[in-house]
Amino acid sequence: MDPYKFRPSSSNDTPFWTTNAGDPVSNNNSSMTVGPRGPILLEDYHMIEKLANFTRERIPERVVHARGMSAKGFFEVTHDVTDLTCADFLRAPGVQTPVIVRFSTVIHERGSPETLRDPRGFATKFYTREGNFDIVGNNFPVFFIRDGIKFPDVVHAFKPNPKSHIQEYWRIFDFCSHHPESLSTFAWFFDDVGIPQDYRHMEGFGVHTYCLINKAGKVTYVKFHWKPTCGVKCLMDDEAIKVGGANHSHATQDLYDSIAAGNFPEWKLMIQTMDPADEDKFSFDPLDMTKIWPEDMFPLHPVGRLVLNRNIDNWFAENEMLAFNPAHVVPGVYYSNDKLFQLRLFAYSDTQRHRLGTNYLQLPVNAPKCPYHNNHYDGFMNFMHRDEEVDYFQSRYDPVRHAEKVPIPNAICSGRREKCVIEKEDNFRQPGDRYRSWAPDRQERFLCRLVNALSEPRITHEIRSIWVSWWTQCDKSLGQKLASRLNVRPNI
């Protein structure tokens, strides 16, 4: 073993107790005192180190998606998509790429029950030969807001009251009463899918519109969908109370136990595609993440399969320190001008540096599994071995060069600097279509949940009236039923 290349690992554990520096500890049961009943001595370094380490075990939890569980596996291409993208990991059917996936709730704290009504996160990290590619999505295909500048506000509204630390619907409906685009997501939130049975029976969506680019430079808009092969299953409200009361980590345990038993969960990756030349032809804006692309207009096409066949080895190292970033794309995949997507490109790396440190990408779970090279040096907790003498670019002593240029979207943008709302809001059509697609019993469950939430005492008559009017514009019969049960007259 080269002592200068040694890295700490439990595979190198000694048979006896030591300090973090490797010094032997002969007694880990008693502190050092002056006599058997005297005061503890400050020179008991092992005790000081043990306590200091303990009081620093926890790191800042994620501001959203704090409660979650990860698993490892592979993604395998099953269908040829080289006409759409030059991405190496999608180069041919049969190609496999290692992945790690993290499932999560969104709003509630680390350790909260996994049976609460809440969107779920579905984040996938592909360790490709061209670098890491992260699809950081949810189990809903839409989101509450369309402009990233409102992201802190919507999270604050859904988070607990800063005075009482209690989550309250009056705060949620007050904030969202200024944002009718949130109706689309509430049509998922208060639906049966608002509480998945577990992570294995849950859909995933990339939510944003991405761009695929082929070798010729042709750009295609794309939406990513994960479809569980075992089907979608949800918990009804009474079931969720029973399950959560018996085991607040039921989804985590289900995922872990299923993989351990060899019952590997699997999802099909499906895509919807659109020619950017057609984006102005629809009643909605295809880059508006509060909208779905109707499947009758944009059918799903299969791409590959995701199989999770290995549990993580250490929850803290591979779940808490796992960091996703929508900005991590590979050649052949790029961003769109979705306003929330654009904000996330900055926000995720920023929060990971706060939570994990400037060198979070050196952590094994986050580091790419391919060679890489840059001059990003030093900083706290830098443990990368480097022996170069040149830490600048360009140099005649270091032959490193620019990478081969890859095609990216090159559409010309023009316009004035301004802060404005998109032209095609179309806030009511899709939630109404979704409601009308349900069977009557499902409609009734949705209505009951909505009525219960809007019946919170602190919600004013004005706010209730706004929501009744909006849902009436989505579907007249829904609005009438809601108005009757809330004793509110629609005001359209």
UniProtKB/Swiss-Prot annotation:
Known EC number: 1.11.1.6
EC supergroup of this enzyme: oxidoreductase
Active-site residues, record numbering mapped to chain: H65, N138
Subcellular location: Peroxisome; Glyoxysome
A Gene Ontology BP annotation from the UniProt entry: response to oxidative stress
Compositionally biased residues, Polar residues: 8-32
Superkingdom of the source species: Eukaryota
Main subcellular localisation: other
Gene3D superfamilies hit by this protein: Catalase core domain
A GO CC term attached to the entry: glyoxysome
Region (Disordered): 1-32
Chain sites annotated for binding heme: Y348
Cofactor dependency: heme
Tissue: Abundant in hypocotyls and roots. Low levels are seen in the endosperms and cotyledons.
Its job: Occurs in almost all aerobically respiring organisms and serves to protect cells from the toxic effects of hydrogen peroxide.
UniProt similarity note: Belongs to the catalase family.
Subunit (UniProt): Homotetramer.
Protein's name in the database: Catalase isozyme 2
